[in-house]
Amino acid sequence: YRPMRRAVLRADVDGGRWFVKLQRPKRHLEYLERMALLAPAGVTPPVVAAPAEGVTITAAAEGVSLAQALAAWSMQGAVEPDPASLLELLGRLPGGVRTLPPQRGHDVRLRMALETAAVELPGRASEIADLGERLLAADARAELGPVVATHGDFYEANIFTVDGRAVSVIDIESLGPGHLVDDLACLLAHLVVLPDLSPAHYGQVPGLIA
C-alpha cells in the first residue's frame, strides 16, 4: 500500500506467519531505530530480520486487531474490548520515544483537513471555515497535559488485542513526543465513523464510546 512509499506483504511459511515491510532506505533506518527503541517494552511485534536495504521482516502480532475485536463483540457477542487496557498499552511506550523528532501537530493536520474539505465541498466552504475557527479556538484553550511518548497513528487497525485487552501496536513510523490526548483523539475520531462505514459490523460501537 502507499505506492512509491511503502508496502507490506504477508508471508505464510512452514506454519508460521511473518510480515515483510518494504520502505525507502531513509525511512527504513528510522523504522529500525524505532523498533529497537520499543523492543525492551514488548509493545510491538519484534523484528526477525532486515535482510536487505529497505526490507524488514517482523513477527505477526498476537491476537486480533481492535477493529476485528469490535466487530466480533458487536456481531457475535464476543468479549467486550477493555478501554482501560488502551491507556495501559500507551503507558508502556518507553520514555525514550520523547527524544525522537516530533510529528506534525494536530493543529497542522486539522488545517490541512479543513482546506481539503473546503476544496471537495465548495458549497459548504463557509460552514467548514466556521467549524474550523471554533475547533482551533477550542484547541488553543485546551489543557493538553505533559509531553509523553505517543504512537502517532493510534487507531483500531494498528492496535492488537487478546481476550479484549489491548496488548500491542503496529505501524510505529509516527512514534514520537506528543500528548496522551493526541493518541486518544485519533482513536476516537476513527471509532465514531465505524458504524457509518459498516453498521452490521460496528453497530454497538457508539454504546462503547459513550
What does each of the following model-derived ranges do?
Residues A39, P94-R98, V192-P195:
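Protein kinase-like catalytic domain
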Residues V55-T56, V64, G152, D182-A189:
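Feature representing long, continuous alpha-helical segments
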Residues R98-G152:
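An alpha-helical support segment within catalytic cores of ATP-dependent transferases
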Residues A7-A11, F19, D139-D182:
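Active-site acidic catalytic loop and adjacent metal/ATP-binding pocket
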Residues M4, G16-T56, V64, A69-R92:
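A conserved alpha-helical element in kinase catalytic cores
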